[in-house]
């Protein structure tokens, strides 16, 4: 079940968006957005492989083809693959660091 916070974030996305979810945590936002065809594509990222483990498990269980990438912010993301960035569930200083 998607939290109210994640539902609000998803409601801001468009069906033509190519999204990267930075710090995806459990991957619920991406799984929901792809399953419901709310975005064109999504890439799930987190800073460490261990942080991606739950998202990787959830994506596998969803039977969806969603890429998961270890990345510090946008460092390992090809800009041509995305047009929308989601950064949520982190403190202000962390978000500002990622955006810089």
Regions found by a protein language model. Give the residues of each.
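A short, conserved alpha-helix within the catalytic core of class I
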Residues: 93-100
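Short SAM/SAH-binding signature in class I
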Residues: 82-89
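Gly/Ala-rich phosphate-binding loop of Rossmann-like dinucleotide-binding domains
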Residues: 34-35
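Conserved SAM-binding motif I beta-strand of class I
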Residues: 41-46
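Glycine-rich SAM-binding Motif I of class I
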Residues: 27, 31
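Conserved alpha-helix/loop element of class I SAM-dependent methyltransferases that forms part
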Residues: 1-17
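Conserved class I S-adenosyl-L-methionine
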Residues: 16-25
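S-adenosyl-L-methionine
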Residues: 49, 53-80
